[in-house]
Design a protein with these regions (language model features):
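Glycine-rich phosphate/pyrophosphate-handling loop used in enzymes and phosphotransfer proteins
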Residues: 1-251
């Protein structure tokens, strides 16, 4: 499935791949061959857990070809976003790359992660239309402590990878209060933790918004963000995540 995805995406992006590819694979540090998929070698692409799995189009949780749509948790607890695009599962080796970017300050990893996300979006079937990208924001205090927002850096990389204009709007969705870290909280605690945490400084009337985040676990952050974006007029909100964790994951 993933191999089939790469060919049309590579054709669509054309020679940009050869110019954008960093020197080494972001997952294993192996030197990339000329013309390789940007950022990640083929061996690591094929080895990423969940890269080839069928997923619920709405929430991104694993599904099977014969699965009853009603069996998915989002059939009874609908998320605020309309669809999910996920590169792979939150598992080795992808989890190490995500945490190295987020907590290890390895900003060079934002580019290959954004490129992977762009490839997964471009390979979506049916095609998903996006008008703009909005990164999930950090609170001012957390941004000051970390020094950067990893989701903004990934969104910029994603936008730079595609040929069609895809504006990144980093300052419209705002986190207006500090919240406890989501990791380690129960599902209910995650939901309550984020109520009233976001506001929107602009309008998105009629737009299809790509909401970028690194990891989705319960979906609470994306749900609350999507609620605020739709209140600001967004026609649809598509969750774009590098890694999809299970709901009981500590991520």
């Amino acid at each position: 499935m993933l191999q089939g995805l790469l060919k049309p995406v590579r054709r669509r992006l054309g020679v940009w791949f050869d110019h954008l590819a960093p020197r080494g694979c972001a997952l294993c540090d192996q030197t990339l061959a000329p013309g390789a998929f940007p950022g990640v070698c083929m061996a690591c692409l094929l080895a990423m857990p969940g890269a080839n799995r069928l997923r619920c189009a709405r929430c991104g949780l694993p599904a099977s070809a014969s699965a009853d749509r009603q069996a998915c948790p989002c059939s009874t607890a609908s998320p605020g976003f309309d669809q999910t695009v996920a590169v792979a599962d939150y598992a080795a080796p992808l989890d190490r790359v995500v945490t190295s970017l987020k907590f290890g300050r390895q900003l060079n990893l934002a580019r290959p992660l954004g490129e992977l996300l762009a490839a997964r979006w471009l390979g979506s079937s049916p095609a998903i239309h996006l008008d703009c990208l909005v990164p999930v924001p950090l609170s001012p205090s957390r941004l000051a402590h970390r020094g950067f927002n990893q989701t903004l850096e990934m969104a910029r990389s994603m936008a730079a990878t595609v040929r069609t204009p895809l504006p990144v709007m980093p300052f419209t969705l705002r986190r207006i209060r500090d919240t406890a870290p989501q990791s380690g909280l129960s599902l209910d605690e995650r939901r309550h933790n984020l109520v009233g945490a976001f506001s929107c400084a602009g309008r998105f009337d009629g737009l299809h918004v790509g909401l970028v985040d690194d990891v989705m676990t319960s979906g609470s952050t994306l749900t609350e963000s999507a609620r605020v974006l739709k209140a600001a007029g967004a026609r649809s909100v598509i969750a774009l995540v590098v890694a999809r964790a299970m709901r009981d994951s500590p991520a």
